[in-house]
Swiss-Prot record:
Superkingdom in the source lineage: Bacteria
Family of this protein: Belongs to the ClpS family.
Protein's organism: Legionella pneumophila subsp. pneumophila (strain Philadelphia 1 / ATCC 33152 / DSM 7513)
The protein's role, per its UniProt record: Involved in the modulation of the specificity of the ClpAP-mediated ATP-dependent protein degradation.
InterPro entries from the UniProt entry: ClpS (IPR022935), ClpS_core (IPR003769), Ribosomal_bL12_C/ClpS-like (IPR014719)
Protein's recorded name: ATP-dependent Clp protease adapter protein ClpS
SUPFAM superfamilies: ClpS-like (SSF54736)
Subunit text: Binds to the N-terminal domain of the chaperone ClpA.
Gene: clpS
Pfam families in the record: ClpS
GO biological process terms, semicolon-separated: protein catabolic process; proteolysis
């Protein structure tokens, strides 16, 4: 291999590298999480409706539908939020239930 061919290969390699280098500017949306209420045998239905209205701003009709889903299916989706908001809502609901001496539990899972 001649010195000239080696220089051409080096230059071509460098040129190809420079052309193929691109900066990715794609921005991903944050992952969403479902906030769930879990059924238990002791929390009154009206308390569950109160929680749904207060913490998730659901109207009476939708709150009752979600409460019935929790009651009959074991869990119900209260809303879908970014991670920080979902974590905050779960903590607030669980604390509120404890303060009112109810075993109601809230949790979250990725959408």
């Amino acid at each position: 291999m001649s010195k000239q061919n080696l220089e051409e290969i080096i230059q071509t390699g460098i040129a190809d590298t420079e052309l193929s280098t691109e900066i990715s500017t794609a921005i991903k949306r944050p992952r969403k999480y479902k906030v769930l209420l879990l059924n238990d045998d002791y929390t009154p239905m009206d308390f569950v409706v109160e929680v749904l209205k207060h913490f998730f701003h659901l109207n009476e009709e939708v709150a009752i539908q979600v409460m019935l889903q929790v009651h009959f299916q074991g869990k119900g989706v209260c809303g879908v939020f970014t991670r920080d908001i979902a974590e905050t809502k779960v903590a607030l609901v669980n604390e509120y239930a404890r303060m009112n001496q109810h075993p109601l539990l809230s949790s979250m899972e990725p959408e």
